Amino acid sequence: MTQTKRNDFVQWFCYLFLLAFLASCEQENKDHLTPIFDGATLTGWHTLGGEANYRVENGEIIGTTVANTPNTFLVTDSTYTDFILELDFKTDSVSNSGVQIRSNSHDWYRNGMVHGYQVEIDPSDRAWSGGIYDEKRRKWLHPLADNPPAQKAYKPNDWNHFRIEAIGDTLKTWINGVPASHLVDEMTDKGFIGLQVHSIGKRGKPGVDITWRNIELITENVEQYLQASPLPAIVTKNQLTFEEKRGGWQLLWDGRTTEGWRGAKINEFPEEGWEINSGELSVLATGGGESTAGGDIVTKEMYANFEVKVDFKITEGANSGIKYYVDTELNKGEGSSIGLEYQILDDKKHPDAKLGNHEGSRTVASLYDLIQADPKKHMNPIGEWNTAHIISKDNKVEHWLNGVKVLQYERGSDEFLKLVGESKYKDWPNFGLYEKGNILLQDHGDLVSFKNIKIKTYGEAEQ
């Protein structure tokens, strides 16, 4: 045997060995998959949302589009945290759909609207099947705009296969064996699995089928069966999502440094009382005093019309706040700088929740000492993250908590001026009426952490 033939033989043998090894790994993986659809009934599943129809035929779940109804979801009765999900699906050339993972339906969130991660089924020319969309929350997190191999992997009008891994904060997807998405996101770690029949609007076609089969899970010893992905991870922590970039949002904090921020009463960032660690900006516990340690911090820039979002996490009994339209020149003495405040508070343990010149106006998400947030608001437990969202355009202001609007008001209105006149701010001239001001994170001497601090501004032409 010549050297060339020997090399060819070795290469061929190695190739066959690799194929056999991969096949054995795939078979071992399949041996540990457990069906969550019995092939005959919809036992273990229920519908949420709209009124699209689901039925079982020939071992397949078939969802059918219906006119004049919102998105419909067939979801598992059980919820899952870490898992590997494999399934087959088929749709026509126009009907968008998706597979929900770690999704939820809570009474407090938009009257039970299904929300959470969706692995997209996209038969359009865009071909983003396998991308990760955040249903009824943040929209696109990992589209396939920069992944042509995954786009080409989708087979129109034919059966396709998804592999989906959800482990900790990491989500990975494959379509027909081709890596599609690799996302690192901390928002939701548990929820149901769901099969979507998308609403079709006025122009869509009713009676179109979307079909799924071989829906199987691994939930035990999941780490043993993970597959490596060559795709670089899209990390959302302290970064702008795809949709945020398209929508004109900017980072207000870079997740690493103090750039863009200073002390409210000094020109530099405080040397003590604040800490940056693992992508979190924390005001430290120093005894519960108002601005007595490091002091409040503010943006160096001032803002007029804007939206700002801040993820915050409190400790037991903690007090803090997000202030806006702040004038740092107003109060150079003791205490916090003056501005409108989105209250951050442990309502159950901090006495401030029962104080104030207007009932309930010092509870979490309220306009501090002026307007109470909706008492039915949902606050995640101590130690978990919550999202504050403040919208201020043309003096019309809204406070949102965890995706739900909890109050609104108009700066400068008769009602607003009356509330100010009855509050602790009655002696501050033009309180809350400035055209623009700083945004502030409050030091109230309790441990509170912040991340994902983002802003969207509106210019004169957009007002």
Report the location of each language-model feature:
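Carbohydrate-interacting regions of secretory-pathway proteins
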Residues: 25-463
